[in-house]
């Protein structure tokens, strides 16, 4: 028994020495102080257990798992994490700034006074346009605003099919710069290049809308009778009629600069119903207007140009007395009751009522339609750029 015990003690002694040496090796080779301390304590606990049984297996596995824990990430990984976070924050800040600039550009259209199509106006073309010959200081500012809003549209949608619109925004016809046709086509705000140009547009170019308006002639004429007055000028215009923009010229608009005028539309249900059925009406664009235009005998509106060549102005004759004349691009024409006349009002034009006072006023119903050669993608982009005020 003693020899057995002695032999046992001899065998156990070297074993403990080996365990102690292994524990010292763990301690000496540890690259991190905290990791080495953890390993030293674990090794000591393992070595101190002389008799291990099956019931000790869970505890041993738990202690052994401490040895296999991953070491801390190196300092370079932490630096990369910080750099990634900084770049992410910078990207989010850039996106915020980009969105803010887009919203400022979209909301500044009407405040800058540059992106407007103007009302129908007594000129049959919408009065002096911003950036046109009567306002030489607006051209560059308007051009820059249109370019910014077009870029905002492209970021939201696409540049596909925007070649002409992009060229128009970058090199719009400022004062005296619009090439036009023989110098008589000078749109004041937007010149869309490569559009077929003629002072008068064939009726077939807008056949559906022309036929719809002409078939609605009786209803539109009744609506005018319901809102008409004596146009004497001795009393203020009744509700819905605009003050005369020129002597002898009055108008009542159902749509003004792309915005519906609800009270006037309710008073003219037949005309409003016809407008709702049109396919090419510029109802969501500041270039789009619709309403009654009245010219009294003796009134004359000297030559001027409309704001853009992207639209065609449709005149439906309601009351056309003798002596009325429309000259567009040097070509004279006259209206006819119940028939439509399509005019490119970006050409220089003049309107006159040379009849006698007994003849009564000349009355036409005017609707702004898209030029038939403006593509659908271009219309969508221009509706975005020249969206009416909310």
UniProtKB/Swiss-Prot annotation:
Keywords: Dioxygenase, Membrane, Oxidoreductase, Phosphoprotein, Signal-anchor, Transmembrane, Transmembrane helix
Parts of the chain on the Cytoplasmic side: 1-72
Subcellular location: Membrane
Matching Gene3D superfamilies: B-lactam Antibiotic, Isopenicillin N Synthase, Chain
EC number: 1.14.11.-
GO cellular component assignments: membrane
Any one GO molecular function term: dioxygenase activity
Compositionally biased region (Gly residues): 41-51, 128-137
Spans annotated as Disordered: 1-54, 116-143
Membrane-spanning residues: 73-95
Keyword GTP-binding: no
Listed InterPro entries: Asp/Arg/Pro-Hydrxlase, Asp/Asn_beta-hydroxylase, IPNS-like_sf
Lumenal side stretches: 96-390
Enzyme class: oxidoreductase
Keyword presence, Oxidoreductase: yes
Membrane topology: Single-pass type II membrane protein
Coarse class of the protein's main subcellular location: membrane
PTM annotation (Phosphoserine): residues: 129
Family: Belongs to the aspartyl/asparaginyl beta-hydroxylase family.
PANTHER family per the UniProt record, alphabetical: ASPARTATE BETA-HYDROXYLASE DOMAIN-CONTAINING PROTEIN 1, ASPARTATE BETA-HYDROXYLASE DOMAIN-CONTAINING PROTEIN 2
Protein name (database record): Aspartate beta-hydroxylase domain-containing protein 1
Gene from which this protein is expressed: ASPHD1
